[in-house]
């Protein structure tokens, strides 16, 4: 892989934990983000800002979002931190299937089916959720 194509070169920490802000922007640029709907989803959203992979998009790039957080204390902070009509905030525990599957949760929102980015940060269950996405 040439150094020009390495995404690590674009690492930039604005709100993310390990520079994902810059890497995500570069990926969106490479896929021509001007043609995207500008919607993202983050579950395991915590307080909505600290180590968020979507907050930079919401704050600085006019994205709309669905932010999902299961923990009541973190969700309370998220509610205080994110005060915009561009964001749908949900206090839900995402499950593999049934009423609280990601698919069913998102069906109840106005997010388009072809949203642009999903960020999953649920401490060890990320793989199992991705495996069950439809």
Outline where the language-model segments fall:
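Short helix-to-loop capping/linker segments positioned immediately adjacent to catalytic or ligand/cofactor-binding
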Residues: 115-117, 129-130
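Short His-centered aromatic/hydrophobic patch
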Residues: 123
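Non-catalytic N-terminal targeting/anchoring module and adjacent flexible stem/linker
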Residues: 1-9
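A short alpha/beta connector and helix-capping loop motif
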Residues: 126-134
């Amino acid at each position: 892989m040439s150094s020009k194509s390495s995404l690590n070169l674009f690492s930039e920490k604005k709100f993310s934990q390990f520079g994902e802000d810059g890497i995500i922007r570069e990926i969106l640029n490479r896929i021509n983000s001007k043609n995207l709907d500008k919607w993202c989803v983050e579950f395991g959203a915590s307080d909505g800002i600290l180590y968020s992979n979507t907050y930079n998009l919401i704050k600085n790039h006019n994205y709309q979002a669905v932010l999902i957080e299961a923990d009541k204390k973190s969700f309370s902070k998220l509610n205080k931190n994110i005060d915009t009509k561009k964001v749908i905030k949900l206090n839900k525990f995402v499950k593999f299937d049934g009423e609280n599957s990601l698919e069913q949760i998102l069906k109840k929102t106005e997010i388009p089916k072809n949203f642009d980015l999903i960020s999953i940060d649920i401490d060890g269950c990320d793989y199992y959720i991705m495996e069950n996405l439809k």
